[in-house]
Amino acid sequence: MNSLEQVKGLIKEEIQAAVLKAELATEEQIPNVVLESPKDKTNGDFSTNMAMQLARVAKKAPRMIAEELVANFDKAKASIEKIEIAGPGFINFYMDNSYLTDLIPTIVNAGEAYGETNTGKGEKVQVEFVSANPTGDLHLGHARGAAVGDTLCNLLAKAGYDVSREYYINDAGNQIHNLALSVEARYMQALGLEKEMPEDGYHGADIIGIGKSLAEEFGDRYAKADEKESYEFYREYGLKYELAKLQKDLESFRVKFDVWFSETSLYKNGKIDQALAVLKERDEIFEEDGATWFRSMTYGDDKNRVLIKNDGSYTYLTPDIAYHRDKLERGFDKLINIWGADHHGYIPRMKAAIQALGYDKETLEVEIIQMVQLYQNGEKMKMSKRTGKAVTLRELMEEVGVDAMRYFFAMRSGDSHLDFDMDLAVSKSNENPVYYAQYAHARVCSILRQGEELGLATGGDVNYKLVTSEKEVELLKKLGEFPAVVADAAQKRLPHRITNYAFELAATLHSFYNAEKVLNQDNLELSKARYELMKAVRTTLQNALAIVGVSAPEKM
């Protein structure tokens, strides 16, 4: 695809060719070509220090080497208009604008596919995120994890990875036991029978509602049923209700999972016993003080970990090891877990487990999501004013909307704390980054509607070479960066780079709009070229916002 990355590739090839032509070094002696984009654009679009790198090998002054490189460089092959030497021997390259203007039809014709790369080469990646206990509402930490996780999945897919989204349902622990007992108590109370809530029960209104629903639908059937049968019923009914609620909230947040994996299935399908057998066979576990231990210190953990306690019960780590073995047996090349900040200390033992099972520790990556602090009217907001409890994903969606939440949560690196300004998130001003990006899209759509009225949408030849002004060239360069931004952000697992890019593209568009009369009835040939440029901006901005899970409105 026609992009700035291709230009960089061509420049690097021609630099290497120039080194050989000038006989400054042999092929084996040529160092890696480093190309940078100068902040000051008067120093060119790209710059290299190759002359300085070659000084020792060529036994010449860098400035002289630079002159020989320039003399042997094929500008036409690399789409370069001019080359300048600066300072002690920096070589600055200025792109040929015709290469940039070719981007316009390339982007327009690619449509939704613009920005796609084959960086991932089809590598199978599983991203497990959110995975909140199904015993209550999703809080803001979960919401941020959902936004970052889903954006990362969209980004990886755009960059050519084969991505699977997975939610791990913690349905085998004590929380689910307490949920079942809470449902039972509320059911009995709805029937008018005396039943105390468990000490660690769930006292929310939704559990009271479940109890009433059960009483209306089943009468006293489960009050009289066998204790084991009724317990299983309360457990399944409560779990099903809570999961449905989670799924509804996540889908409203534009997050859909490919797999909902039950922890209980690990027990039912013998996966835990199988994982323990593998560890035993590999001599990774030992018995001590009546417990079974994992030799995690072998792999850099700060201490060995108990897998089976002396009462025969498993620690949290044991089903987690079985779960990760199951993931790897499903054929994933890479596992990415998105965890809350409270799980930071858990990473070394899981990395150790991956190695103990016979896999490279880099097979597992863990991205940590830090907490969110809400602000309203300039003050910290600790509790919901409506419920008096922690603010939930659902409640914040109702307050500020999905677009603002998705953008704000994905706007910073996940491992940094996030201050979420609710007033800013709903403001219709340039200070609001999501409004700023969306308004740029709406502005482009408005220009395109004007273009249609001028008859610019009729097709026919377009003279792209007319797109030459300083602001137009800035816009073209920013458009050309998108595939490289996608590839780099995906490789480095930095989804916030996409919100950064959307903001930068919006700023470049607004700058162009404020400096130029975009469409001019007196110059329809230039207007036609700019109309196509605006279509390219619309496509690129839509594609960037789509990765973040944010809508691109046509009017605002």
UniProtKB/Swiss-Prot annotation:
Database matches in HAMAP family? Arg_tRNA_synth
A Gene Ontology term for the protein's cellular component: cytoplasm
One Pfam match, by short name? Arg_tRNA_synt_N
EC numbers for this chain: 6.1.1.19
Please report the organism this UniProt entry assigns to the protein.
Bacillus thuringiensis subsp. konkukian (strain 97-27)
Q: Name the InterPro entries for this protein.
A: aa-tRNA-synth_I_CS, Arg-tRNA-ligase, Arg-tRNA-synth_N, Arg-tRNA-synth_N_sf, ArgRS_core, DALR_anticod-bd, Rossmann-like_a/b/a_fold, tRNAsynth_Ia_anticodon-bd
Protein's name in the database: Arginine--tRNA ligase 2
- Primary residence: cytoplasm
User: What is a GO molecular function of this protein?
Assistant: ATP binding
